[in-house]
Protein backbone atom coordinates (compact mmCIF):
# COMPACT_ATOMS: atom_id res chain seq x y z
CA UNK A 1 0.00 0.00 0.00
CA UNK A 2 0.87 3.65 0.40
CA UNK A 3 2.87 2.87 3.58
CA UNK A 4 5.10 0.46 1.66
CA UNK A 5 5.77 3.13 -0.97
CA UNK A 6 6.67 5.66 1.73
CA UNK A 7 9.03 3.09 3.23
CA UNK A 8 10.55 2.42 -0.21
CA UNK A 9 11.21 6.13 -0.78
CA UNK A 10 12.42 6.86 2.76
CA UNK A 11 15.47 9.15 2.62
CA UNK A 12 17.27 6.95 5.16
CA UNK A 13 17.58 4.22 2.51
CA UNK A 14 19.71 6.48 0.29
CA UNK A 15 22.95 8.44 0.38
CA UNK A 16 23.72 11.77 -1.29
CA UNK A 17 26.03 10.15 -3.85
CA UNK A 18 25.03 10.36 -7.53
CA UNK A 19 24.01 6.68 -8.03
CA UNK A 20 21.85 6.69 -4.90
CA UNK A 21 20.16 10.02 -5.72
CA UNK A 22 19.51 8.78 -9.28
CA UNK A 23 18.10 5.45 -8.09
CA UNK A 24 15.73 7.10 -5.60
CA UNK A 25 14.59 9.61 -8.23
CA UNK A 26 13.89 6.81 -10.72
CA UNK A 27 11.76 4.85 -8.24
CA UNK A 28 10.04 8.05 -7.11
CA UNK A 29 9.31 9.13 -10.71
CA UNK A 30 7.79 5.74 -11.60
CA UNK A 31 5.48 5.94 -8.58
CA UNK A 32 4.64 9.64 -9.08
CA UNK A 33 3.76 9.32 -12.77
CA UNK A 34 3.03 5.69 -13.66
CA UNK A 35 5.19 5.96 -16.80
CA UNK A 36 6.56 2.91 -18.61
CA UNK A 37 10.16 1.66 -18.38
CA UNK A 38 11.00 2.69 -21.96
CA UNK A 39 9.37 6.10 -21.41
CA UNK A 40 11.56 6.79 -18.38
CA UNK A 41 14.75 5.59 -20.10
CA UNK A 42 14.10 7.94 -23.03
CA UNK A 43 13.30 11.08 -21.02
CA UNK A 44 15.38 14.14 -21.85
CA UNK A 45 16.33 16.89 -19.40
CA UNK A 46 14.26 19.36 -21.45
CA UNK A 47 11.14 17.17 -21.08
CA UNK A 48 10.77 18.45 -17.51
CA UNK A 49 8.80 21.67 -17.19
CA UNK A 50 9.35 22.90 -13.63
CA UNK A 51 7.31 26.07 -14.19
CA UNK A 52 4.14 24.15 -15.11
CA UNK A 53 5.10 21.14 -12.97
CA UNK A 54 4.77 18.51 -15.65
CA UNK A 55 6.81 16.21 -17.82
CA UNK A 56 6.54 15.44 -21.52
CA UNK A 57 6.48 11.68 -22.06
CA UNK A 58 6.89 9.93 -25.40
CA UNK A 59 4.86 6.74 -25.24
CA UNK A 60 4.12 3.84 -27.53
CA UNK A 61 3.92 4.68 -31.24
CA UNK A 62 5.75 7.96 -30.50
CA UNK A 63 2.61 9.38 -28.91
CA UNK A 64 3.39 12.33 -26.65
CA UNK A 65 1.50 13.12 -23.48
CA UNK A 66 1.93 15.58 -20.65
CA UNK A 67 1.97 14.09 -17.16
CA UNK A 68 1.63 16.30 -14.05
CA UNK A 69 4.29 16.22 -11.34
CA UNK A 70 3.66 16.51 -7.58
CA UNK A 71 5.74 18.69 -5.20
CA UNK A 72 7.66 15.71 -3.90
CA UNK A 73 8.90 14.50 -7.31
CA UNK A 74 9.69 18.09 -8.39
CA UNK A 75 11.97 18.35 -5.33
CA UNK A 76 13.56 14.96 -6.16
CA UNK A 77 14.15 15.93 -9.80
CA UNK A 78 15.75 19.27 -8.87
CA UNK A 79 18.08 17.53 -6.42
CA UNK A 80 18.88 14.86 -9.00
CA UNK A 81 19.69 17.46 -11.68
CA UNK A 82 22.16 19.14 -9.28
CA UNK A 83 23.97 15.80 -8.94
CA UNK A 84 23.70 15.07 -12.67
CA UNK A 85 25.40 18.39 -13.47
CA UNK A 86 28.65 16.99 -12.00
CA UNK A 87 29.03 14.93 -15.20
CA UNK A 88 28.88 17.80 -17.71
CA UNK A 89 27.42 15.13 -19.95
CA UNK A 90 27.04 15.73 -23.66
CA UNK A 91 23.87 13.64 -23.76
CA UNK A 92 20.56 15.32 -22.92
CA UNK A 93 19.13 12.06 -21.58
CA UNK A 94 17.68 12.69 -18.12
CA UNK A 95 19.04 9.62 -16.38
CA UNK A 96 22.67 8.61 -16.75
CA UNK A 97 24.81 5.62 -15.83
CA UNK A 98 27.49 5.97 -13.14
CA UNK A 99 29.86 6.94 -15.98
CA UNK A 100 27.61 9.73 -17.29
CA UNK A 101 26.27 7.85 -20.31
CA UNK A 102 22.65 7.34 -21.40
CA UNK A 103 20.88 4.91 -19.10
CA UNK A 104 19.37 1.78 -20.65
CA UNK A 105 16.23 -0.25 -19.90
CA UNK A 106 17.97 -3.23 -18.31
CA UNK A 107 19.86 -0.98 -15.91
CA UNK A 108 16.66 0.84 -14.89
CA UNK A 109 14.98 -2.54 -14.34
CA UNK A 110 17.88 -3.68 -12.12
CA UNK A 111 17.81 -0.42 -10.12
CA UNK A 112 14.08 -0.76 -9.41
CA UNK A 113 14.40 -4.46 -8.57
CA UNK A 114 17.28 -3.76 -6.16
CA UNK A 115 15.50 -0.88 -4.41
CA UNK A 116 12.25 -2.83 -4.07
CA UNK A 117 14.09 -5.94 -2.83
CA UNK A 118 15.59 -3.99 0.06
CA UNK A 119 12.18 -3.00 1.42
CA UNK A 120 9.34 -5.04 -0.05
CA UNK A 121 8.48 -8.71 0.15
CA UNK A 122 6.43 -8.91 -3.09
CA UNK A 123 7.55 -11.56 -5.55
CA UNK A 124 7.36 -9.16 -8.49
CA UNK A 125 9.73 -6.20 -8.29
CA UNK A 126 9.78 -4.18 -11.49
CA UNK A 127 8.97 -0.78 -12.99
CA UNK A 128 5.64 -2.25 -14.11
CA UNK A 129 4.77 -3.05 -10.48
CA UNK A 130 5.31 0.65 -9.68
CA UNK A 131 3.12 1.60 -12.66
CA UNK A 132 0.44 -0.77 -11.38
CA UNK A 133 0.79 0.65 -7.85
CA UNK A 134 0.45 4.20 -9.21
CA UNK A 135 -2.77 3.28 -11.05
CA UNK A 136 -4.23 1.34 -8.13
CA UNK A 137 -3.48 4.10 -5.59
CA UNK A 138 -4.97 6.73 -7.92
CA UNK A 139 -8.16 4.69 -8.39
CA UNK A 140 -8.38 3.83 -4.67
CA UNK A 141 -8.13 7.54 -3.83
CA UNK A 142 -11.07 8.32 -6.11
CA UNK A 143 -9.49 9.19 -9.47
CA UNK A 144 -11.82 8.38 -12.36
CA UNK A 145 -10.90 5.64 -14.80
CA UNK A 146 -10.67 7.97 -17.79
CA UNK A 147 -8.17 10.29 -16.07
CA UNK A 148 -6.00 7.33 -15.05
CA UNK A 149 -6.22 6.05 -18.65
CA UNK A 150 -4.87 9.41 -19.91
CA UNK A 151 -2.10 9.51 -17.30
CA UNK A 152 -0.97 5.98 -18.22
CA UNK A 153 -1.06 6.76 -21.95
CA UNK A 154 -3.54 4.01 -22.73
CA UNK A 155 -5.51 4.22 -25.96
CA UNK A 156 -8.40 2.06 -24.78
CA UNK A 157 -10.21 2.07 -21.46
CA UNK A 158 -10.01 -1.75 -21.51
CA UNK A 159 -6.25 -1.56 -20.96
CA UNK A 160 -6.80 0.60 -17.88
CA UNK A 161 -9.55 -1.60 -16.45
CA UNK A 162 -6.92 -4.24 -15.66
CA UNK A 163 -5.87 -1.97 -12.79
CA UNK A 164 -9.37 -1.89 -11.29
CA UNK A 165 -9.25 -5.54 -10.16
CA UNK A 166 -7.83 -4.70 -6.69
CA UNK A 167 -10.25 -1.81 -6.37
CA UNK A 168 -13.22 -4.10 -7.13
CA UNK A 169 -11.98 -6.60 -4.51
CA UNK A 170 -11.76 -3.73 -2.02
CA UNK A 171 -15.32 -2.63 -2.90
CA UNK A 172 -16.60 -6.17 -2.34
CA UNK A 173 -14.97 -6.22 1.10
CA UNK A 174 -16.46 -2.84 2.03
CA UNK A 175 -19.84 -3.97 0.71
CA UNK A 176 -19.77 -7.17 2.77
CA UNK A 177 -18.81 -5.24 5.90
CA UNK A 178 -21.26 -2.39 5.44
CA UNK A 179 -24.41 -3.68 3.75
CA UNK A 180 -27.03 -4.91 6.23
CA UNK A 181 -28.01 -7.89 4.07
CA UNK A 182 -24.57 -8.83 2.74
Where in this protein do the model-derived segments appear?
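Conserved catalytic core of the tyrosine transesterase superfamily
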Residues: 1-182
Amino acid sequence: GVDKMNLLLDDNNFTDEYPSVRDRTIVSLFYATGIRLSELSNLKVQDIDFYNQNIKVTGKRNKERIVPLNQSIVKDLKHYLEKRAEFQSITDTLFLTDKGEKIYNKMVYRIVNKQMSSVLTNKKKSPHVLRHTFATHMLDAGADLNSVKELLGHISIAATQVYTHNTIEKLKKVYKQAHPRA
